[in-house]
Amino acid sequence: MAKKELAKIKLQIPAGVANPSPPVGPALGQHGLNIMQFCKEFNARTQDQKGMIIPVVITAYADRSFTFITKTPPAAVLIMKAAKIDKGSGEPNRNKVGKISIEQVEEIAKLKLPDLTAKDLDSAKRSIIGTARSMGIEIK
């Protein structure tokens, strides 16, 4: 018989540096999960992506066990890294804060493709371009 699923917890945690402090501790603690075990497993799985924010979906089961799936970093984080900026524009239609090339857009789209609802690379690229424009970043 399959385990009874208690909850799905979605978090965004910096890669390789998960610790029991908020937001991880309270989110897992309220479901009775072993926080340190999760932190060790997450850090081991993401140590090659240090510095990136990694979305994770944790499935908690009734017997207090858990499984988790790591996703690709958010598109906005990848775009900011490619444009070498700290944050997007407050007024994206007026103030442009950076530029990225079509090649960089394609690279980000290839990386994000498994997590996007896009059917092919072209629609994934359009999605990434839309995100970049809404952040005040020009595509050259």
UniProtKB/Swiss-Prot annotation:
One of its GO terms (biological process) is translation. One of its GO terms (cellular component) is cytosolic large ribosomal subunit. One of its GO terms (molecular function) is structural constituent of ribosome. Gene3D superfamilies: Ribosomal protein L11, C-terminal domain (1.10.10.250), Ribosomal protein L11/L12, N-terminal domain (3.30.1550.10). Keywords: Methylation, Ribonucleoprotein, Ribosomal protein, RNA-binding, rRNA-binding. The keyword Protein biosynthesis does not apply. InterPro entries: Ribosomal_uL11 (IPR000911), Ribosomal_uL11_bac-typ (IPR006519), Ribosomal_uL11_C (IPR020783), Ribosomal_uL11_C_sf (IPR036769), Ribosomal_uL11_N (IPR020784), Ribosomal_uL11_N_sf (IPR036796). It holds the Pfam family Ribosomal_L11_N. CDD domains: Ribosomal_L11. Coiled coil: none annotated. One or more lysine residues are methylated. Part of the ribosomal stalk of the 50S ribosomal subunit. Interacts with L10 and the large rRNA to form the base of the stalk. L10 forms an elongated spine to which L12 dimers bind in a sequential fashion forming a multimeric L10(L12)X complex. Forms part of the ribosomal stalk which helps the ribosome interact with GTP-bound translation factors. Belongs to the universal ribosomal protein uL11 family. PANTHER family: 60S RIBOSOMAL PROTEIN L12 (PTHR11661), LARGE RIBOSOMAL SUBUNIT PROTEIN UL11M (PTHR11661:SF1). NCBIfam families: L11_bact. This is Large ribosomal subunit protein uL11.
